Amino acid sequence: MIEQFLMVAGAHFLALLSPGPDFFLIVRTALLHGWRRASGICVGVALGNGLFIGLAWAGLSAIQPGSPAFTILQWAGSLYLAWLGWQLLRSPGTSITVDGSTHGAPRPGWGQGLRMGLASALLNPKNALFYASLFSLLAGTPRSLQALYGVWMVSVVLGWDLLVAAAAGHRAVVERFARHLRSIERVTGATLLLIAVGVATQALANR
């Protein structure tokens, strides 16, 4: 049982370390508005992951590679990421002072961040695929233990994202990147567009 837990926890954490749309959204928001604002995105991301975990735990296999639901998820995620990336690329720019005040960008509410994080997690087909694959390997494991694994993974997602937000929103980090926020926004926007193109390409390849 301990070996299985270490396998599940290790695979999940390694997947978590891979930077994706959630990571870039959290870092940008924390740099601009502080970790408390970014925590809304963190909670939304954790809830989105929790929904996919719940579906995988329940044994619902509708979201599988090649299925209509998975294809719809791929295209919806691609369009959402492309929209986010384009918004950042066409932004007139944001300046920030070391006290955390910003100019040129509205301060998002906590609830708005939660909705953005939830959408980012739910519209990421890699999340659905990862959890479906992981729970398929646990078919012989007691359901109660699978549920505990699910709770553990949601907690780790939330804890890790909050840690990223706290690090990016630290005063020393903000001071270091205060003069480069426009470049960070452009890089973030370009990265999200590239991810969107990659997801769309996969969707076309799976037709």
What are these regions (language model features)?
Residues 2-71, 133-149, 153:
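Juxtamembrane transmembrane-helix termini in multi-pass membrane transport proteins
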Residues 6, 10, 107-119:
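Alpha-helical membrane-protein architecture signal
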Residues 13, 17, 50, 86, ...:
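Hydrophobic/aromatic residues within the transmembrane alpha-helices of Major Facilitator Superfamily
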Residues 22, 48, 52-59, 81-84, ...:
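Alpha-helical transmembrane segments and their lipid-water interface positions
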Residues 35-113, 197:
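Membrane helix-loop-helix hairpins that form the core translocation module of multi-pass transporters
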Residues 66-96, 153, 160-161, 175-207:
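Selective transmembrane alpha-helices of multi-pass membrane proteins
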Residues 78, 120-132, 189-192:
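Core segments of transmembrane alpha-helices
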Residues 169-174:
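Short, flexible, glycine-rich and Lys/Arg-enriched loop motifs at helix boundaries
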